[in-house]
């Protein structure tokens, strides 16, 4: 939160599971941090946090939750929201956490409504996400940005340009590559 305010940038970050021991539920969430003077020349001293949830657990999450306490099992608490974040002149952003990127219904809702889709991921199957990103960029006609954990690599930014050599804006391919990248995305 402090870093987002210091650099005056909207920041998305994955966080650990929320475990509700009373309800025996597990939630997978991310946070969006918006500094109070974002997109101005003023220095930000505080920020607002919004929690964004995940609808579909991955198979690995299902197994982890199942084995967590077999005598008194936990369940995954789904967040059915499909987020569209209005960032003003920078366009509207559809936000997705990991396995929700496989949810085709989401793209029908986002088509014509967003200029960007941002996916926070902890994904070993990076080739599937790469293939889906190209298809989604062309079907939804928006930029697709995948921010994968550095351990598995393959973060990328893909845009639906007509000329194929322009489509891949950024790709960090390979395991154990930790990086921060600033890129320009088209907004139409």
Please provide the spans of the model-predicted regions.
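CN hydrolase (nitrilase-like) catalytic-core segments centered on the catalytic cysteine
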Residues: 1-18, 23-24, 101-187
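Active-site catalytic loop in hydrolytic enzyme cores
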Residues: 20-112
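Acidic Ser/Thr/Pro-rich low-complexity disordered segments
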Residues: 38-55, 163-176, 188
């Amino acid at each position: 939160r402090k870093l987002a305010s210091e650099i005056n940038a909207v920041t998305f970050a994955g966080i650990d599971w929320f475990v509700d021991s009373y309800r025996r539920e597990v939630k997978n969430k991310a946070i969006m941090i918006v500094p109070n003077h974002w997109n101005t020349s003023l220095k930000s001293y505080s920020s607002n946090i919004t929690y964004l949830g995940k609808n579909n657990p991955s198979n690995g999450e299902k197994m982890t939750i199942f084995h967590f306490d077999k005598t008194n099992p936990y369940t995954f608490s789904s967040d059915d929201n499909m987020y569209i974040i209005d960032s003003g002149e920078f366009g509207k952003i559809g936000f997705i956490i990991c396995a929700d990127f496989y949810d085709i219904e989401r793209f029908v809702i986002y088509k014509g409504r967003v200029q960007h889709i941002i996916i926070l991921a902890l994904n070993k199957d990076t080739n599937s996400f790469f293939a889906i990103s190209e298809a989604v960029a062309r079907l939804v006609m928006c930029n697709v940005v995948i921010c994968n954990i550095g351990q598995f690599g393959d973060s990328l930014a893909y845009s639906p340009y007509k000329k194929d050599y322009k489509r891949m804006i950024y790709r960090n391919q390979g395991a154990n590559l930790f990086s921060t990248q600033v890129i320009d995305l088209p907004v139409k």
